[in-house]
UniProtKB/Swiss-Prot annotation:
Keyword Cell inner membrane in annotation: no
Keywords on record: Disulfide bond, Hydrolase, Protease, Signal, Thiol protease, Zymogen
CDD domains: Peptidase_C1A
Range of residues in the leader sequence: 1-16
Name this protein carries in UniProt: Digestive cysteine proteinase 3
Top-level taxon of origin: Eukaryota
Length: 321
């Protein structure tokens, strides 16, 4: 990890600490030289202080969720945003079909994990391929509902093979473009046959290893009511969110609400796998792709019915099979 051209002010000269040593051991950190390690330790110490200060707000009832140290502890928020996102800005083309809310009865809470149609949490690593993980997650769910078979699908194939559809591998992409590619390609390979490598490679699709097919995609009407109906009646839904904030980088537990979140600046693709209410606070249950050590075992509860916080209902979609 290169030393960024950034200097942290107001920090004393870093000295060895048990928490820093534990962090390096836990996440296998090794740095190029002493200068870089000193810089990373200073970043870690600053994040450690920010986490402590934030959790005091939780204890005082000022916020509804907690944060905790995780694998991003030696990254500034700017570095984190440059590396860990991947939902592209700009036009994605016109949707081929739209799901609209019908104001019918819906379950009070949904968790598709309990129906065994959600694969374990995956890890995109330092590659902006969130869009691929969101897309495979939605297709894995639809494939299960139709075929009663849970198959983990290849994100690496989407990274390598869908560039003609506007996607840019680790440089970012769109879930709807991934669905279009899978449809036109005649399917997507299983993860076991085409494993994830967290880097752009040449396309190695094998028609003999297809795990699922896709017949098209549907864009959900951009309201939380429609998204709730889709999650309840259709299954896990691909969504894009604003995940640019320190609070998201280190989210740990509780119902996430970020007052500075944008409903239109969407930079991260994730998967809505349910919804519910916790201590009177409505939430969306969201599967992330940063491994199980992030958040609540790889998941986050995001505020629901709070003016589309973080844009979760701004661009939902799902594949058809």
């Amino acid at each position: 990890m290169k030393v960024a051209a950034l200097f942290l002010c107001g920090l004393a000269l870093a000295t060895a600490s048990p928490s820093w040593d534990h962090f390096k051991t836990q996440y296998g950190r090794k740095y190029g030289d002493a200068k870089e390690e000193l810089y990373r330790q200073r970043v870690f110490q600053q994040n450690e202080q920010l986490i402590e200060d934030f959790n005091k707000k939780f204890e005082n009832g000022e916020v509804t969720f907690k944060v905790a140290m995780n694998q991003f502890g030696d990254m500034t928020n700017e570095e984190f945003n440059a590396v860990m996102k991947g939902y592209k800005k700009g036009s994605r083309g016109e949707p081929k079909a739209v799901f609209t809310a019908e104001a019918g009865p819906m379950a009070a809470d949904v968790d598709w994990r309990t129906k065994a149609l959600v694969t374990p949490v995956k890890d995109q690593e330092q590659c902006g391929s969130c869009w691929a993980f969101s897309a495979t997650g939605a297709l894995e769910g639809q494939h299960f509902l139709k075929n009663d078979e849970l198959v983990s699908l290849s994100e690496q194939q989407l990274v390598d093979c869908s560039t003609d559809y506007g996607n840019d591998g680790c440089g970012g992409g769109w879930m709807t473009s991934a669905f279009d590619y899978i449809k036109d390609n005649g399917g997507i390979d299983t993860e076991s046959s085409y494993p994830y490598e967290a880097e752009d490679r040449s396309c190695r699709f094998d028609a003999n290893s297809i795990g699922a097919i896709c017949t098209g995609s549907v864009e959900v009407q951009h309201t939380e009511e429609a998204l709730q109906e889709a999650v309840s009646g259709v299954g896990p839904i691909s969504v894009a969110i604003d995940a640019s904030h320190f609070s998201f980088q280190f989210y740990s537990s509780g119902v996430y609400y970020e007052q500075n979140c944008s409903p239109t600046f969407l930079d991260h693709g994730v998967l809505a796998v349910g919804y519910g209410t916790e201590s009177t606070k409505d939430y969306w249950l969201v599967k992330n792709s940063w491994g199980s050590s992030w958040g609540d075992a790889g998941y986050i509860k995001m505020s629901r019915n709070r003016d589309n916080n973080c844009g979760i209902a701004s661009e939902p979609s799902y594949p058809t099979v």
